[in-house]
A protein has these predicted regions:
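Carbohydrate-interacting regions of secretory-pathway proteins
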Residues: 1-214
Length: 214
């Protein structure tokens, strides 16, 4: 049954077991006006993990020579501040076969992965995992510093990889598996995926919309 924005129902398995569920319609997140940006904020100070928190007891992230380094698969890492709309600059480097990701508001993953010279897919470098496909493969490959410049306004996202726009003002339909939560209308942190293996990040700068930090 649908009541306003909430859907309630029952699923019956082939074995006859019944399971009730409740779902809430995803918000449209339409903005009435173009964003007014606040001053840029450096999220990583190059010295320690101030402003960040590991998800889980075992934290393998370290600040090494100005680089936020994930030395092995383990805990994910999130900012302690939460954001609504923003522009994000972040530089990253992965080893051969590396796999990580940058979750926007902790819910929408921009994939970081070594995909070689393959044709782009939504789970390849720069894609919005599971949803949006980059229009071109402009990866520099493993063991080389690369850059993302990402703009997120409501559900609309633009991703530039190494200075080339590969996703241009497209709508993100939903959340990525592994998201922190499904509360899409709420502010959320920047979330760096660390559970797959080694990866490094540096020069992480966010420009939030005015009054868009919690």
């Amino acid at each position: 049954t649908l009541a306003g924005e909430v859907l309630n129902g029952t699923i019956t398995t082939p074995a006859g077991e019944q399971h009730r569920f409740t779902g809430t319609r995803a918000p449209l997140l339409r903005r009435a006006a173009a964003p007014t940006w606040d001053a840029p904020v450096t999220l990583f100070n190059g010295k320690d993990l101030t402003g960040w928190a590991p998800l889980g007891e075992n934290n393998q992230w370290k600040a090494v020579d100005g680089v936020l380094t994930n030395v092995k698969g383990g805990a994910n890492l999130v900012t302690t501040a939460k954001y609504t709309d923003f522009k994000l600059h972040i530089e990253f480097k992965y080893p051969k076969g590396g796999n990580s990701g940058v979750y926007l508001r902790g819910r929408h993953e921009v994939q970081v992965e070594d995909n070689g010279d393959r044709e782009p897919q939504p789970d390849h470098l720069g894609g919005i995992y599971g949803f949006l496909v980059p229009n071109e493969n402009v990866s520099r490959g493993p063991d080389v510093w690369q850059t993302f410049d990402i703009t997120l306004v409501g559900r609309r996202v633009t991703v530039a990889l190494n200075g080339k726009t590969i996703i241009g003002d497209q709508t993100i339909p939903g959340i990525t598996g592994g998201a922190l939560d499904s509360n899409e209308g709420e502010p959320g942190p920047i979330f760096l995926q660390g559970d797959h293996g080694p990866v490094a990040y540096r020069n992480i700068v966010i420009t939030p919309v005015k009054n868009g930090v919690r």
